[in-house]
Swiss-Prot record:
One of its GO terms (cellular component) is mitochondrion. Keywords: Coiled coil, Mitochondrion, Repeat, Stress response. It is found in: Mitochondrion. Belongs to the LEA type 4 family. Mitochondrial heat soluble protein acting as a molecular shield in water-deficient condition. The keyword Zinc does not apply. Residues 41-62, 182-238 are annotated as: Disordered. GO terms for biological process: response to desiccation. Its main location: mitochondrion. Residues 182-200, 213-225 have a biased composition (Basic and acidic residues). Residues 50-202 form a coiled coil. This is Group 3 late-embryogenesis abundant protein, mitochondrial.
Length: 238
């Protein structure tokens, strides 16, 4: 009787293991109940003890089956969890690679833009240089034109002095006229040369300033681009 009650308690405790083990647990519980009833109705108790022992073995077998089922379910859950973790790791790795590729494209685009602007600044400087050279050519041309005018005036004076009936006073007056015209021509050339020189210096100054500003802007953009790339790499590593 005491043994049958212990079997009943073991069977009832095993009923809380897992949903998958419910059929075996119910069978063990029912067997224990019948064992109690049979033991209480038996006079000698020995047949009841034998039957209770057999039911105890059946209950133990059912408990083992239930434990095996629980272990199987636990392993399946563990395998699924491990698979989920691997999928999550793969997703994070793929995302990091995508971010890295995107950051590389952004950096390359920024680098191309900086190179294009640098080339543009270089072209501007070349244009300013050509313009300054053009100013110098204009100065030379103006000086040559003035010199030609002076030569023409001198030749005219020579002709007048050597002409028949030419007088000393006329020659003197002509010479004064030539000198005045030569001085006027020289002053005009000097004035034009000064203006052109100022313009050339202004052009060179503007081009140099523009080139310096472009270099500063390009350097700042390069630093900004490198900082952005560094931040993206840091986030991808995290």
């Amino acid at each position: 009787m005491f043994l049958a009650r212990n079997v009943s308690r073991v069977a009832l405790r095993s009923a809380s293991l897992s949903p998958a083990a419910i059929p075996q647990q119910q069978h063990a519980g029912v067997a224990a109940v019948y064992a109690v009833r049979f033991a209480s109705s038996s006079g000698s108790g020995r047949p009841a003890d034998n039957w209770a022992e057999s039911q105890k073995e059946k209950a133990k077998a059912g408990l083992k089956d239930a434990q095996a089922e629980v272990g199987k379910v636990a392993r399946e859950v563990k395998d699924k969890a491990a698979g989920g973790i691997e999928q999550a790791k793969d997703a994070v790795k793929q995302g990091a690679n995508d971010l890295k590729r995107s950051g590389s494209r952004t950096f390359e685009n920024a680098k191309d833009d900086i190179q294009a602007k640098a080339q543009h600044a270089k072209s501007d400087l070349k244009g300013a240089k050509h313009q300054a050279e053009g100013v110098v050519e204009n100065v030379k041309e103006a000086a040559e034109n003035a010199w030609e005018k002076t030569k023409d005036v001198a030749e005219n004076l020579k002709d007048k002095v050597q002409s028949p009936g030419g007088l000393a006073d006329k020659a003197a007056n002509a010479w004064e006229t030539v000198k005045d015209r030569a001085q006027d021509a020289a002053s005009e050339v000097k004035h034009k040369a000064g203006d052109l020189k100022d313009k050339a210096q202004q052009v060179i100054h503007d081009a140099t300033t523009q080139s310096g500003d472009n270099r500063k802007q390009d350097q700042q953009q390069r630093r900004d681009s490198q900082g952005s790339q560094s931040g993206q790499n840091s986030r991808s590593r995290n």
